[in-house]
Swiss-Prot record:
GO terms for molecular function: ATP binding; ATP-dependent DNA damage sensor activity; damaged DNA binding; mismatched DNA binding. This is DNA mismatch repair protein MutS. PANTHER family: DNA MISMATCH REPAIR PROTEIN MSH1, MITOCHONDRIAL, DNA MISMATCH REPAIR PROTEIN MUTS FAMILY MEMBER. ATP binds at residues 621-628. It comes from Pseudoalteromonas translucida (strain TAC 125). The lineage of its organism: Bacteria, Pseudomonadati, Pseudomonadota, Gammaproteobacteria, Alteromonadales. It comes from the Bacteria.
């Protein structure tokens, strides 16, 4: 519409109901408004058009504005959660406007107000959440010096973290790890292209990103004078982001947030850093197609509880370097295996369920009746769990038991207060157990026993009056009455008060019936009102226990992860890794944790040795021979050791790794206009610029996307730089057999190959890693296996012979190719003379300076 919908003169022209709608909508212009009208939530104007398109619902019209029909769409109130779930998944936010006034007493439109705002990052209703995935609200801020501050909150657990990073690469990796459901960024944020793929990205006003305001908000939330005790006081960029996030949560939730009790600063030096390419290539929790199948998480995650599943995924994405913490996890797994308790612990933990999110909903006052029974079941499951673990000598397990004590008073309260199987909603009552409150029992009994009382009264009045046809009736206009035929009207006692005269009957009321009427008509509504009051009172009783319950939930999630990894180790024949102070890697008969689960035939295990004498393995062998699998399994075994898991190997000694890099596979990045080769080179540059001697680097087929000599030269220079300049532990797979000569020239380089046996025109892949370089690539044999026509294979063989004969005469060796590469590099890079000439300002040179400069330039030639 061309006119200003929210202008005062426009609003005045509307009906009273539409005036009310527009005033409320003007406060929530950027999001959808669900406006409650009877049994429906209605949407109007552009909201109606958008909702009709997104939800595939009918669009109608109601009234006119500016001479045009007002678009309208609606959803039934009883099905609203389903529609909200769909909108949230699309990244939409919705303001829920409810009727808060009494229609019976309202003059004009019933009073309405927005009672909650549902956004992708702040939802708490279990119907809207993925139970085994974190649902994070994230806020980002970039300072003038380029530092990124990132704050993220899981409102369903109260975990509130901040981190600062200094590069686009680190920022992208962090956002990929968090996978936020909703992301807030400032109007001045320049690198929007780094976050534009996030459905729930929201631009916020610049004034919301203010350090002083952030510090005030956070201190107010935590009840502290400053933030020193949390260790975040110096992280100014992160605090600015956290302040915006906290204000947003307060605005959308509109209630206290008692379960958000602390803020934690992440330290990158404590973690094994994974960049975005590594997370993608290793398929940790998402496969290359965007699904969950055949990922590391799918193999490892058999947790009993959703909160345990979420914790396991967080650990997979945040491997740590702290040996004490890792050994604590590994020793706890060993203790569980020693007492053979995996199965029993799993069943006990299943009874505890997702208590983490239940506690958050209780804190947010959005819990439903069945959340109370879930908390009750969790508390009831603690006693048998303690019995199982009472004799545990492991310090971590003992600490878990200490952090999850039984709470008999709270358990007894919930057992008394809530029925065994309550309804989904409190709306219609039937949640509070009989015997919990005597007044509620009285109102319920009165409502349920009304018929019996009336039957007894009717019999008594018949006997008292002698009128056998006397009966008690009810209608909405006159309420309860005693009906007597006109023929018997003369028998009516004096205390009967006429209420209505009909053609053949008279209707009366007596004080006892009037008293009963008042009680019965009000008993159901009074029972429901009292039950809702008692239900809300339960929240207040639970509130003082929130902090203790959160500690309990975190401890039990940890136990679930440890028990799950113990079961995986037992079932899948994993070994306990030994964590070393050096940066060596020694794996005996390692296996790929995912591939071995999907293969029908037995997986061929292989060793890996990386140390000062074997810094880099140059891996050759045929396509389909297993080079990529061998490299990936090494990275996954190292990663699993750094999350505190047993590993798929006969044994493993894993050193202190600071980062894992992968350059495996590539595809065009069409959205950014980057070719496959450009993507490959960008990832290679990231590795060469960031790897250290403590890094594990996986390089697969560097240099494929350009000419043979260019590709070979780049592969040579990359391998040489990694080995000679960085000394990173590297697995370098290649089809450039010329690179195998590097092992003779560079200390610490070793050739290995994936074995294959050729018989006539066929090939058998042995998938065994052997020392030495491969003899050939078997490319034609693999092509034949793929179904390439025989005539094409034969022609390729003839061409291959010609090329091999020609190459033996003309092809330069590796040193010559390196020289060529260096010459090319020199041609690309400006010489010292060129740099000096570029810097000259002729207008500001004296004759003497010009003379001296000429001699200097000549000396540089």
């Amino acid at each position: 519409m061309s006119f200003d919908l929210y202008a005062p003169h426009t609003i005045k022209q509307q009906t009273p109901m539409m005036q009310q709608y527009l005033k409320i909508k003007s406060e929530h212009r950027d999001i959808l408004l669900f406006y409650r009208m009877g049994d429906f939530y209605e949407l109007f104007f552009d909201d109606a058009k958008r909702a009709a398109q997104l939800l595939d619902i009918s669009q109608t019209q109601r009234g006119k504005a500016g001479g045009d029909p007002i678009p309208m769409a609606g959803v039934p109130y009883h099905a609203v959660e389903n529609y909200l779930a769909r909108l949230v998944q699309m990244g939409e936010s919705v303001a829920i406007c409810e009727q808060v006034g009494d229609p019976a007493t309202s003059k004009g439109p019933v009073d309405r107000k927005v009672v909650r705002i549902v956004t992708p990052g702040t939802i708490s209703d279990e119907a809207l959440l993925q139970e085994r995935q974190d649902n994070l609200l994230t806020s980002v801020w970039q300072s003038k010096n380029g530092t990124y501050g990132i704050a993220y909150l899981d409102i369903n657990s109260g975990r509130f973290n901040v981190v600062e990073v200094n590069t686009d690469e680190a920022f992208t990796s962090t956002i990929q790890r968090l996978a936020p459901a909703e992301l807030l960024y400032s109007e001045s944020f320049e690198n929007v292209h780094l976050i534009e793929h996030i459905k729930g990205a929201r631009r916020r006003p610049e004034w919301e990103f203010d350090l002083d305001t952030a510090q005030h908000l956070l201190c107010e939330q935590f009840g502290t004078k400053d933030l020193v005790g949390f260790g975040v006081d110096k992280a100014h960029c992160a605090l600015v982001a956290a302040g915006c996030l906290m204000q947003y949560v307060k605005d959308t939730q509109r209630i206290a947030l008692p379960h958000i009790r602390a803020i934690t600063l992440e330290h990158n030096e404590h973690a094994v850093i994974l960049d975005a390419a590594t997370r993608k290539n290793l398929e940790l929790t998402v496969n290359l197609s965007g699904g969950f199948e055949n990922t590391l998480a799918q193999v490892l995650d058999k947790t009993a509880t959703p909160m345990g599943s979420r914790l396991l995924k967080r650990r997979i994405h945040t491997p740590v370097r702290n040996k004490d913490e890792l050994n604590s996890r590994l020793n706890a797994i060993s203790a569980i295996l020693d007492v053979q308790l995996c199965g029993e612990l799993h069943e006990s933990l299943r009874e505890i369920g997702d208590v983490e999110r239940v506690i958050a909903r209780l804190a947010l006052c959005t819990a439903r009746p069945r959340d109370l029974t879930r908390l009750r079941s969790a508390l009831q499951a603690l006693a048998p769990l303690h019995t199982l673990l009472n004799d545990a000598s492991d310090p971590r397990i003992a600490s878990i038991i200490k952090q999850s004590p039984e709470l008999p008073d709270l358990q007894a309260l919930l057992e008394r207060a809530v029925i065994e199987n309550p309804p989904v909603l409190i709306r219609d009552g039937g949640v509070i157990a009989p015997g919990y409150n005597s007044e509620l029992d009285e109102w319920r009994n009165l409502s349920k026993g009304a018929t019996d009382v009336l039957d007894q009264l009717e019999l008594r009045e018949r006997a008292r009056t002698g009128i056998s046809t006397l009966k008690i009736g009810y209608n909405r206009v006159h309420g309860f009455f005693i009906e007597v035929s006109r023929a018997n009207a003369h028998l009516v006692p004096a205390d009967y008060i006429r209420r209505q005269t009909l053609k053949n009957n008279e209707r009366y009321i007596i004080p006892e019936l009037k008293e009963h009427e008042d009680k019965v008509l009000g008993s159901q509504s009074k029972a429901l009102a009292l039950e809702k009051q008692l239900y809300e009172e339960l929240f207040r009783f639970i509130a003082p226990h929130i902090e203790q319950l959160q500690i309990m939930a975190a401890a039990l999630a940890d136990l679930d992860v440890l028990n799950n990894l113990a079961e995986r180790a037992l079932t899948l024949n994993y070994a306990k890794p030994i964590l070393c102070d050096n940066d060596n890697i020694s794996i005996k008969q390692g296996r790929h944790p995912v591939v071995e689960q999907v293969m029908k035939e037995p997986f061929i295990a292989n060793p890996v040795e990386l140390n000062a004498q074997r810094k880099m393995l140059i891996i050759t062998g045929p396509n389909m021979g297993g080079k990529s699998t061998y490299m990936r399994q090494t990275a996954l075994i190292v990663l699993m050791a750094h999350i505190g898991s047993y590993v798929p190997a006969d044994s493993a000694k894993i050193g202190n790794i600071d980062r894992i890099f992968t350059r495996i596979g590539a595809s065009d990045d069409l959205a950014s206009g980057r070719s496959t080769f450009m993507v490959e080179m960008t990832e290679t540059a990231t590795i060469l610029n960031n790897a250290t001697a403590q890094s594990l680097v996986l390089m697969d087929e560097i240099g494929r996307g350009t000419s043979t000599y260019d590709g070979l030269s780049l592969a040579y220079a990359t391998a040489d730089h990694l080995a000679s300049k960085i000394s990173a532990k590297t697995l370098f797979a290649t089809h450039y057999f010329e690179l195998t000569e590097l092992a003779e020239q560079t200390p610490g380089l070793v050739n290995v190959h994936l074995d294959a046996i050729e018989h006539n025109d066929t090939i058998a892949f042995m998938h065994t890693v052997l020392d030495g370089a491969a003899s050939k690539s078997f490319g034609l044999q693999v092509a034949a296996l793929a179904g390439v026509p025989r005539s094409v294979i034969n022609q390729a063989k003839q061409k291959l012979k010609l090329l091999e004969n020609h190459q033996s005469v003309t092809a330069p060796n590796i040193e010559q190719q390196a020289f060529t590469f260096n010459n090319q590099a020199q041609q690309i890079s400006p010489s010292e003379v060129e740099l000096q000439l570029t810097a000259i300002d002729p207008d500001n040179l004296s004759p003497r300076q010009a003379h001296d400069l000429l001699y200097k330039l000549k000396a540089l030639l």
